[in-house]
């Protein structure tokens, strides 16, 4: 499968999303390794809290997908599962996430996969459209500025955008030179 969902009961107080995460990361990886071999995404839920990551993502980096599209209000609680399914798992969006929004850093010591968060996804697409709209000769040549709070994943957002600039609309972007300057 390309995604694994592990659900825990919302009415049992002794089961949590952490239990769901442990089941995927320890039991499934140990007992059913072929299940996770080509799995890109994993979702954990206790009915009220739903989060997404990869089979390599530490629990603290699982996140909620709180919007179906960038114009909607944030949803949470019981509606969070429906929002995640509509927002991250619609056919077109799921293909986009798998193709452009999962990053596997080079690391010999452990397996790592960075999966986009919904603000990164929407920001990268919005910037892509803005860059296309401002290309010369019809536009002013300015791509714009992206501002994000500390810890919001700006570097990954720009990495995802760079991947799209380099691989999509080759007729428009014509082999762009991309320079990313980070402060670390």
Positions of PLM-derived features:
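ATP-dependent helicase/translocase motor core
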Residues: 1-182
């Amino acid at each position: 499968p390309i995604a694994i969902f592990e659900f825990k009961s919302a009415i049992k107080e002794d089961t949590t999303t952490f239990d769901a995460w442990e089941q995927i990361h320890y039991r499934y990886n140990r007992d059913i390794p072929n299940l996770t071999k080509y799995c890109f995404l994993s979702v954990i839920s206790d009915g009220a809290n739903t989060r997404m990551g990869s089979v390599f993502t530490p629990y603290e980096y699982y996140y909620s997908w709180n919007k179906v599209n960038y114009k909607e209000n944030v949803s949470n609680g019981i509606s969070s599962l429906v929002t995640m399914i509509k927002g991250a798992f619609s056919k077109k969006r799921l293909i986009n996430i798998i193709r452009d929004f999962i990053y596997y850093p080079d690391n010999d010591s452990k397996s790592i996969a960075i999966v986009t968060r919904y603000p990164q996804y929407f920001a990268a697409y919005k910037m892509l459209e803005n860059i296309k709209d401002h290309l010369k000769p019809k536009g002013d040549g300015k791509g714009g500025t992206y501002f994000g709070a500390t810890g919001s994943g700006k570097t990954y957002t720009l990495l995802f955008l760079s991947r799209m600039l380099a691989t999509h609309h080759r007729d428009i972007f014509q082999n762009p030179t991309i320079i990313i300057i980070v402060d670390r």
